[in-house]
Amino acid sequence: HTPEGFRDAYQAFWQAGWPSLSCAPDDGGQGLPAVLECVLYEWLAGANHGWTMAPGLLHGAYECIKHHASDALKAQYLEKVATGEWLATMCLTEAHAGSDLGLVRTRGVPQPDGSVRVNGSKIFISGGEHDLTDNIVHLVLARLQEPGKEAPSGPKGLSLFLVPKILPGGKRNAVVCERIEEKMGLHGSPTCVMRFDDATGWLVGEPNKGLNAMFVMMNAARLGVGNQSLGLTEVAYQN
């Protein structure tokens, strides 16, 4: 559970339309300039950095899904992420694969129905589990393990998968938070170790082109870190 008041604050936040400021109107957004979103997250980070971590990855996830996911995935997830009704994560790092993503071992095995079964573990996942929203959309970097065909080694063999906490139809997916990471600060944000045990997911973009799609989200996250830093610096200066 997140700290008292976090869920109520987040529900009011997304229902008022704040996460969708710069998303396209056709996707449930407002179509406003991205600079307004930067100002918003600067203020929010200065007020409560831990809480602000939750929606901080939303726009990157929205852009990633919009530009790389299939039409079927967009129909199911794009508007939910654009409006902030569902939150999202960026699942890259593994215990043995930090800055060198070429060492990623998590696997996605294709299924006859077009889905994949994802198996592996990810660490340092911001917002990997929480009670702020009814669903969490995990974007997971892994290797596509097709029958009789091994993915290329290194970063060129990575694919991207969308793995929801709750599956269409309401069933809980086989993805769990094993533990919360110990940190020096930012305790209001759950940084999780996530385990995928035959979790159902779907390929985002082309096979073995996962980094291309994930960089859309990563670049947005980098801009978000700048906004957070500015907000924290501003409130430190004011006080």
Regions found by a protein language model. Give the residues of each.
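Short Gly/Pro-enriched turn/cap motifs at secondary-structure boundaries
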Residues: 96-99, 129-131, 151-152, 183-190
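A glycine-rich, basic-preceded beta-loop-alpha segment at the flavin cofactor/substrate interface
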Residues: 124, 166-183, 190-221, 238-239
